[in-house]
């Protein structure tokens, strides 16, 4: 049991929710009345999200969600934080709970074989296995599994095209896919199996479950795991890391990255300096000045973002 004050719950569940719109208001009210913050996505295909609150509040929310028909057994991972990692609570209605943009993909009908964290090393060490990181380029940049291919995608929508263009790398191989918490692999493996590949596997519970359960000394993970909240990234044991976000482009940056001549807090980093005009950087600099003034007044540090 962690002594940290905030519990972070990452969850998803694919299940038919024909009346998903009606779930929004009760969820939003429960979260707001219990001080829970984060994001929950609802769609006809299920629920997905990450939220944080006191342990008691998160327990109440999970009880509410699992009482909904079809959502009794979500994929659920807990971690802990020293500070509230979200600024507000959002419950959104979506077309997909994870956006791939390919019609007809249904993980309830066809999906890859789940591999437990304890069995993952043996699979990816097999010379006949090709390991595919289904996440985006900025996530891959700060951490991945040994030998994993980087599709160099900016969004998950680009992943199907990468698969189509790289079929030769997958032919005749065991295909082992992974992502942060497992949800992207539900659709990624369903898509790949739909193309006719048979030996398709994915890491159950994703990187987060692996980092939680596999000891550092046995780990084949290198680096940190990007998470979509103010913690930015976590390491083995789901400990918070020293990775931060560039507030101009939202890329993760390490302490070493902050030594770059192109880094200016809230204004630019080496990754985005050439992507912005001098006018952009001047605008960001003014915004950063206002953020600092707000912090000095004790206001929320996200003002102006």
UniProtKB/Swiss-Prot annotation:
Any one Pfam family here would be: Rhodanese
Residues forming the catalytic site:
179 (cysteine persulfide intermediate)
Instruction: Please name the InterPro entries in this protein's record.
Output: Multihaem_cyt_sf (IPR036280), Rhodanese-like_dom (IPR001763), Rhodanese-like_dom_sf (IPR036873), TrhO (IPR020936), TRHO_N (IPR040503)
Q: What class of enzyme is it?
A: oxidoreductase
Domain (Rhodanese) spans 125-219
Its Enzyme Commission number?
1.14.-.-
One GO MF term: oxidoreductase activity, acting on paired donors, with incorporation or reduction of molecular oxygen
What NCBIfam families does the database record attribute to this sequence?
PRK00142.1-4
* Family as reported in the entry's similarity comment: Belongs to the TrhO family.
Question: Would you tell me the protein name for this molecule?
Answer: tRNA uridine(34) hydroxylase
Q: What is the native source organism of this protein?
A: Brucella anthropi (strain ATCC 49188 / DSM 6882 / CCUG 24695 / JCM 21032 / LMG 3331 / NBRC 15819 / NCTC 12168 / Alc 37) (Ochrobactrum anthropi)
